[in-house]
């Protein structure tokens, strides 16, 4: 569980959410069994709402792991979306490629292989949405590298970080105060 909310509350929230099926469910199970960090069910439901409202056409994801988020984004948005994602772990890259191929999304999702600090410098163009889900200690660096790439659409910016508040709550002086 997350250490942010009471385990029973988190369990209740997750039980009320619809289960994924098909490949996404397989990837959730694989991630759980192999301790691969992917977005949680409640986060994916929130992201689904954001995606449907914002309707990004070009997404940058920093931190691909097994490709779950990219596949999820593409499945929610369908049609006309381009997703560029970065990953440095060779095992994860191979697994992500396999999963993206199984999803039939090779034409929509591109994996840039290598350290994000370097691969981000090679990307051209602007993005409608940037999802940062990589080394939490590098978030400021990633922000600095990508903030100018975020397209301004109707004065709306969509920059998402995953698990940005967890280190705050894991500090001993705060660990029992927000549950």
Model-derived features with residue positions:
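A short alpha-helical cap/connector motif
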Residues: 1-129, 136-157, 162-179
